[in-house]
């Protein structure tokens, strides 16, 4: 249920501008850049409101919060369809940003932590397996609707889907279970470091890896072209990222679930640097290898963002803590396409030295976090 609702949430909001930006800009008389700036502003607002949304899930449970996010999504999408200029465009994405703060992965992970406690790892992995197909499923739907009924009606259709499909699915979620005080975080889980220090470290890890993820999502074909690949070859190689993400998540679900999540996170954080080094050293012949390695690491890291804090700190206060730790990652998600575009324009594939360094830094932080031997 939650996996399907998350597929709808991601596909109708986060992945929507990639399909509708050109149609929106043409009719409103603004550049596509302004469409993506409005989208980024919505992401920034979701980062600001994320901790409050997480705290609300801690107190009320996802069964009450997630359906409200569907209402907000529906309102924002309806406003987007009614947009008549740049100001109404920004207003619509601000409303959608409110919905994203309480309706995407962080909220879903917090909901599962409230329902299953420390046993939520498999459920979190399952959610990412299903919702990992959001772009695969929703991009063709949005493109077809845009061509047949127009971008405004497409927004209305997605708004209706939130009311008729997403909200009923979220209303069927189980009630959260009481979280025992014994599930509170243990100082030993961080090898004597304070909880706030570990939280800050994880926040950096998630921000660094998400910067790499969103940079590649926005610019991967161009990166591969800079390495010497033709446009057709670059697009074909970039298409391997999605299957690699899903394949890695299946591997995590069946094999790596017996290991502590920090092991998965360490491996995942090294994937992008290894792939980047391979591409820089070998050039275009390594384009497919880079896409597969990067995609696999990105797929597992998405899971780690939900399971690692749960394993280290427990389910108590998970929503608020997750919102605080993920706020920087959401910020970088909104700004990284612009920053990496500057780096790529100036340095070509040399821009991968920067993202690769971020991955190595993330691994270093994860390597400094110690867990009790009995949970490793």
PLM regions with names:
Residues 13, 17-22, 195-253:
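Extracytoplasmic gate region of multi-pass secondary transporters
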Residues 126-175:
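Helix-loop-helix hairpin linking two adjacent transmembrane segments in secondary transporters
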Residues 48-86:
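Conserved MFS/SLC helix-loop-helix module at the cytosolic interface between two early adjacent transmembrane helices
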